[in-house]
Regions:
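Nucleotidyltransferase catalytic core that binds NTPs
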Residues: 1-185
Length: 185
């Protein structure tokens, strides 16, 4: 089983680490690849591709040999969307937070994105992923393409919270050290 964990990781937090660790423990035969979004994606305040990649390398090493990081999206000449990336990682399970899942209809190549791929959804506090699925005809029809991690202990940490507050306990010590060394955020 191949698990691809995509996102901005701006920066990678303890929540990202704990989700990846949980998935590797739950799926003993799985390998996990972090797939950071390129700065070519129209998202404000992303630090450089290289810095986010290096921070994910730190997280991957801490997780062990079944975790790695891909430059696939970072090295594309233009942002083409998750659908295009999942064509490259054919047959994988794509991990996303419920905050992103709530807007999946707006993603490039929806509904084919949902029809042709499998997803692992990580709920956040207050999210009702099942209600979201049942409220949408395509999501309901392809319900079997979604694994919802309802048994995962929800963590109320986010990269945006770190960027806003600079609260150091949101990050792994090694990531925090990297951020301080390079004067990021």
């Amino acid at each position: 089983m191949l698990i691809v964990y995509g996102g901005a990781f701006n920066p990678p937090t303890k929540a990202h680490y704990q989700i990846a660790k949980y998935l590797l423990e739950k799926y003993q035969d799985a390998n996990l690849i972090f797939l950071p979004t390129s700065t070519k994606y129209a998202k404000a305040d992303l630090v450089s591709n290289d810095h986010r990649y290096q921070m994910l390398e730190i997280v991957s090493k801490k997780l062990g040999k079944r975790a790695s990081c891909s430059r696939y999206e970072l090295d594309q000449e233009e942002f083409k969307g998750t659908y295009y990336s999942l064509q490259h990682f054919k047959g994988c399970y794509y991990v996303m937070g419920a905050d992103n899942f709530n807007y999946i209809e707006k993603w490039i190549n929806y509904p084919n994105l949902v029809i042709e791929n499998k997803f692992i959804i990580v709920p956040r506090l207050g999210d009702d992923v099942e209600a979201k699925i049942l409220s949408n005809e395509i999501l309901t029809k392809y319900r079997d393409n979604f694994i919802v991690l309802n048994d995962f202990k929800k963590i109320d940490l986010s990269a945006s919270l770190y960027r806003k507050t600079k609260e150091e306990d949101i990050l792994l010590d090694e990531v925090l050290e990297y951020i301080k060394m390079h004067n990021l955020y």
